[in-house]
């Protein structure tokens, strides 16, 4: 197709199931802002959804995000909530959906100060105020 006939954004593909995904490993050296800048390119490829690795706060220095230490916060090292909102806006503008890998059964536990709820459960067991956070 000649460049002049090539759409600049894909039709709205945010409804329904993904028909094609493109996976991005968001990490500190390729944060949410950089990922957002891919939106028009991905739309031109004809995919329906961007698929990302976990975006929640992970162990300091994590390159993959599967060692979550705060299940309630977008990782500041990736751009935080501001970065997530920018990504969402860019994808919306390009008519793309978003699939985020979540890992409720994974946690980074190596550093007590990074995951105090887990360490409190280790110390206090079922009497911990965080016992219901985990399957113990």
Regions found by a protein language model. Give the residues of each.
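Acidic/aromatic-lined carbohydrate-recognition and catalytic surfaces
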Residues: 2-136
């Amino acid at each position: 197709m000649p460049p002049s006939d090539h759409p600049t954004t894909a039709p709205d593909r945010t409804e329904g199931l993904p028909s094609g995904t493109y996976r991005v490993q968001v990490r500190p050296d390729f944060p949410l802002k950089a990922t957002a800048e891919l939106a028009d390119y991905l739309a031109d490829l004809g995919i329906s959804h961007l698929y990302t690795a976990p975006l929640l706060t992970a162990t300091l220095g994590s390159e993959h995000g599967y060692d979550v230490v705060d299940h309630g916060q977008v990782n500041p090292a990736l751009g935080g909530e501001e970065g997530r909102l920018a990504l969402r806006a860019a994808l919306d503008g390009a008519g793309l959906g978003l699939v985020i890998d979540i890992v409720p059964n994974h946690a980074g536990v190596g550093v007590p100060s990074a995951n105090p709820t887990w360490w409190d459960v280790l110390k206090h067991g079922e009497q911990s105020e965080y016992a219901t956070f985990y399957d113990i």
